[in-house]
């Protein structure tokens, strides 16, 4: 709603024209109870107003009628001062549409005061004529009329003086408001800056709010994309229709002016006016095109301001994502470095294991005197080492992972399965033995044999107590290795020599069997019966097939 320059004045006239209500009459005296509402602007009471003067009650029974007549000008004076003084301040705080320096405002104020005064006087005359029983003590009607005329003359002089003093007070108020505006003008700028800073701090502080705003804006843009083309076409069509209608109206106006020119040929002034109208209409068409272009530019700028706010939120969200990516990338690089260090720490252990196996084989070949004892003790170790080679890589991987978790200081999760341990205790004993052998190379051979026996006994006992799955496969591997070694040795040796030796062994066995049968002595009283060849063969081979107890019989 646009405020007109006379809206505030009309409100003041309405409030000033409210009539007071009079009370009852008692004991032949005039008992007046006046309740007057304090007039003022709609914006609220201004400081400095005295509310006690707005409501007055006269309870004195000996009050004269002049008291009633004097209440009206006093209240009018107060309302006049109240309406004239705070009005410029109120109007200056707004957009300046209402100013008290207009001459029409002064005329309306004076007219309102005269109307109030006349209405109150007429009301008093009506009350006096309607109540003949009301008489003032010690006064007469003539005296009342004289007093009433005196009061009205005094009111007129006071109003004239106020009308003269009003321009001076208005100019003073204008100066005060001009100085006040010059002082107060820089304050809104600072408040706007502080609000913008607070908003920027809030958006940068909370990343979740930025992300939520980003999601909301992205969803809004995606929804607008579906209807964007239709809306553009619709707006273009409405713009074209408006321009066409405007052009039609302008052409109609020009046609009317052309039809009006032959009617006003004799009048030169009318001809000049018609020419001016034609020029103004042409200028109006140009102004309409300019207004349309400016309106489009203004709409584009407003849309750009809205989009810039959305883009600012999106940029903030992208910066947060970049910061998060940089942080996670740094953590990933640190984890990679830790894993590389763990792998480097485990590589020397693998090299040590290979060296220990080679040195063990060399030491066994270089000790012919203790060959039997060492081979017996080394059989399970070789079996274990042969089985361990296939599973060492998996064990190293599991151990590396567990050690990396320990170094990082994080606990393994409960859902993570426990790492299987494929390495038995005697393998660690072998590693310790090899370390001792490296340290004590110059020691004597018996001391080395004793260490071998000591390590062999717990390894065998642990093997019996804790049988593992890979023992069978390791035994099979050792047997296969022995067979391959035997084949290779046979291939290397002379085949004729081996064949001759085998033939001699078989011939000796056959001869021993035949001599045992031919030179066997017969025993007296032995049963003689004819048996088949299979029974005689069983009888011959019974010492080898029957069980024999070499020990004494049980008691």
Swiss-Prot record:
Composition-biased stretches (Basic and acidic residues): 451-465
Keyword Cell inner membrane: no
Tissue distribution of the protein: Expressed at high levels in pre B-cells, mature B-cells and pre T-cells. Expressed at low levels in mature T-cells and plasma B-cells. Expressed in germinal center B-cells, splenic marginal zone cells and B-cell lymphomas. Expressed in neuronal cells in the cerebral cortex, epithelial cells in tonsil, adrenal glands, zymogen-producing cells in the stomach and epithelial cells in seminal vesicles.
Regions of compositional bias (Low complexity) in chain numbering: 91-102
Lineage per the UniProt record: Eukaryota, Metazoa, Chordata, Craniata, Vertebrata
Coiled coil: 227-341
Family of the protein in this entry: Belongs to the IRAG2 family.
Residue positions where Phosphoserine is found in the record: 363, 370, 424
Membrane topology, record value: Single-pass type IV membrane protein
Residues covered by region (Disordered): 84-103, 128-147, 437-469
Transmembrane residue ranges: 496-516
Record PTM Phosphothreonine, positions in chain: 91
Species of provenance: Homo sapiens
Protein name: Inositol 1,4,5-triphosphate receptor associated 2
């Amino acid at each position: 709603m646009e405020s007109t320059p006379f809206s505030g004045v009309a409100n003041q006239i309405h409030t000033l024209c409210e009539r007071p209500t009079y009370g009852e009459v008692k004991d032949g005296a005039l008992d007046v109870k006046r309740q007057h509402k304090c007039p003022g602007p709609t914006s609220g009471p201004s400081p400095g107003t005295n509310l006690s003067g707005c409501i007055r009650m006269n309870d004195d029974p000996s009050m004269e009628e002049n008291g009633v007549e004097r209440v009206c000008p006093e209240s009018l004076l107060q309302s006049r001062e109240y309406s004239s003084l705070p009005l410029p301040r109120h109007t200056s705080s707004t957009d300046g549409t209402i100013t008290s320096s207009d001459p029409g405002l002064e005329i309306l104020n004076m007219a309102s005061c005269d109307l109030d005064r006349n209405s109150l006087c007429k009301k008093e005359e009506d009350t006096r004529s309607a109540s003949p029983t009301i008489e003032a003590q010690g006064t007469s009607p003539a005296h009342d009329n004289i007093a009433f005329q005196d009061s009205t003359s005094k009111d007129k002089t006071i109003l004239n003086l106020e009308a003269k003093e009003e321009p001076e007070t208005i100019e003073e108020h204008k100066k005060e408001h001009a100085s006040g505006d010059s002082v107060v003008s820089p304050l809104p700028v600072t408040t706007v800056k502080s609000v913008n800073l607070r908003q920027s701090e809030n958006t940068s502080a909370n990343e979740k709010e930025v992300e939520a705003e980003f999601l909301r804006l992205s969803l809004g843009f995606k929804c607008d994309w579906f209807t964007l083309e239709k809306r553009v076409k619709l707006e273009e069509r409405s713009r074209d229709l408006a321009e066409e209608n405007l052009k039609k109206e302008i052409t109609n106006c020009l046609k009317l002016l052309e039809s009006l020119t032959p009617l006003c040929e004799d009048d030169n002034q009318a001809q000049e006016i018609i020419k001016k109208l034609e020029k103004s209409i042409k200028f109006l068409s140009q102004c309409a095109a300019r207004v349309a272009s400016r309106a489009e530019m203004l709409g584009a700028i407003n849309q750009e301001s809205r989009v810039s706010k959305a883009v600012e939120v999106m940029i903030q969200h992208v910066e947060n994502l970049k910061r998060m990516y940089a942080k996670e990338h740094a953590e990933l690089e640190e984890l990679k470095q830790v894993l590389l260090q763990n792998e480097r720490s485990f590589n020397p252990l693998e090299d040590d294991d290979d060296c220990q196996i080679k040195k063990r084989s060399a030491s066994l070949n270089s000790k012919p005197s203790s060959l039997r004892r060492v081979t017996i003790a080394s059989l399970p170790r070789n079996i274990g080492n042969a089985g361990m080679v296939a599973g060492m890589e998996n064990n190293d991987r599991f151990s590396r992972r567990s050690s990396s978790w320990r170094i990082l200081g994080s606990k393994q999760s409960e859902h993570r399965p426990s790492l299987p341990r494929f390495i038995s205790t005697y393998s660690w004993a072998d590693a310790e033995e090899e370390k001792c052998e490296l340290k004590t190379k110059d020691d004597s051979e018996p001391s080395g044999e004793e260490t071998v026996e000591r390590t062999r006994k717990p390894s065998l006992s642990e093997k019996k107590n804790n049988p593992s799955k890979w023992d069978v496969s390791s035994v099979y591997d050792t047997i296969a290795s022995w067979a391959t070694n035997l084949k290779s040795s046979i291939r290397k040796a002379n085949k004729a020599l081996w064949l001759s030796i085998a033939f001699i062994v078989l011939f000796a066995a056959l001869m021993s069997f035949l001599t045992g049968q031919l030179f066997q002595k017969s025993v007296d009283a032995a049963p003689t019966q004819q048996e088949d060849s299979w029974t005689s063969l069983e009888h011959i081979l019974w010492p080898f097939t029957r069980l024999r107890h070499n020990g004494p019989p049980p008691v």
